[in-house]
C-alpha cells in the first residue's frame, strides 16, 4: 500500500512540474506579447544617424541628440567629422572621430550642431555644403541644433520654410538664409527639423524618437534618461528672460561675431594711434573691425560695441595704451 501511495505521489509531482512549465511558457509568451503591444515595431526605418562634428561646435548641441537618439534600438549613431582624428568643441574638449564626410554617402538622419564664429564660417564651406546636399537627397530626416541651422540654411533647403535656431541667431537665419523663423523649442518642416539653442536639441531628439517609435517608446526613453527638467528659474529664451539680461547677452554676442559678420580688410594699411583697443584692451594686431577719428588721431577697435563704448566718454581714455 505504501508503495502504491509513493508511486501516486511521484506521478502527481511530475504532473505538477509539467503544469508549472506549461504555465511558465504561457506566461513568457504573454509577457512578450504585452511588450510587442506596448512597444510596436518602428513606424519609420532608421538604421544610421550621423552627428556632424567640427572644431568649435557647441558640446551639448551634438552630445544631447547623440545620447537621446542612441536609445533607438538597432540604429547606428556615430560622429562624422570634416576630417578624421581629434575634433575640439568650443571649449577645447577633444573627441576622437573615426569617420569623415568623405566616407559617408548616406544617412537616415543627419544632425548638424551649432557653435559660434566657426559655425558661421562653415556657411561658406562649399565642400561641407555639397556633402550635406548629397546626404539630404536620400535622408529620412535632415536636422540641426542651435546655430547649426545656419549651416543647413546655407544649403538653401530652409529658404521659405519654417525653422528655428538659437535666440540670438534668428535674424541671421531669416536675413541670410530666408527661413520663416518661429519662436518654438523645435520646428518640423517636412523632413527638416530645427531646434532652438543647445538644450533644445534633446527635446527635438525625443520628438524624432516619437515620430519613429511612438509614444510608449519615447516615454520609456525619457524614463531611462530620467529626463525631467526642473530649472531653478523660469527663463532660458529672449521672450521669458529679464530685458536687461537679454540686452547684456545680446551685446556680448554682437561683439563676439562682429569680425565674422563684418570683416574689414581695408584697415590693414592704416597706421593707428593706439596699439590696443581703448575699451577692452585687446591688441589691435588680432584684428580691427571699426575705427574712429578723434582729436586728429585715428583709433582702431576690435568691434563696433567697443567703439561705441569709447565714444560715450572718449576723454576718459586719454593716455591709455
Task: Give the label of every model feature segment.
Residues 4-12:
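Sec-dependent N-terminal signal peptides
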Residues 13, 17-142, 150-154, 170-171, ...:
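Extended, subdomain-level signal for the structured scaffold at the beginning of enzyme domains
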Residues 158-188:
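A conserved active-site-flanking secondary-structure segment within enzyme catalytic domains
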Residues 183-196, 226-227, 233:
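Conserved Rossmann-fold dehydrogenase catalytic segment
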Residues 274, 289, 296:
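Residues immediately within or flanking Cys/His clusters that coordinate Zn2+
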Residues 277-280:
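Short cysteine-rich clusters marking metal-coordination/redox-active sites
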Residues 285:
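Short functional micro-motifs and their immediate structural scaffolds
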Residues 304-321:
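Short metal-binding segments enriched for Cys and/or His
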